Amino acid sequence: VSRFDKRKNHEKVLMALRNLKQIYPDIVYICIGYGEEENNIKELVKELDLSGQVMFFKDISDDLKNALLAKSNIFVMPSIVHKTSVEGFGIAFIEAAQYSVASIGGKDGGASDAIQHDKTGMICDGNSLEDIYSSLESMIKNKRYLELGKNAKALSLKFNWSNTIEEYKKILTKI
């Protein structure tokens, strides 16, 4: 669930997926979004022979997006710094966590605000194909994503409007 741009790092995820499909032939990567890199990413899917593993959705309802998240095991967005663009707070990771979906995020940007490494997901070096691959493989192996997803769900509960309002009130009373 993200825009298709260089910062989101779909290319490296696809390269890791190419290797993972040898071990896990039923693996599927669901892409929800649009953006300037969409055609390049679709072309890379063909080049890497991943058409059977990658599904694309865009302009879908919130209900369908939420249903796809709920059926997912892992949310992966190992963002990188691209030019001067850095990932902000990882709201997409929190959305996934609400459905007990563990996440893999990049060490650059806001993923670490939403993911507790080795507790609710994994933080990896998005510039390293090996790190992305090993993070995915580690979660898939022995279905580790189930435990991390359960923890992610618990963490996501603190990111609701009531808690956010209370945090703002605390800040404002200090001013």
Task: Tell what function each PLM region has.
Residues 13-16, 29, 132, 168:
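A structural motif in glycosyltransferase catalytic domains
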Residues 117-118, 122-129, 138-143:
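Conserved acidic donor-binding segment of nucleotide-sugar-dependent glycosyltransferases
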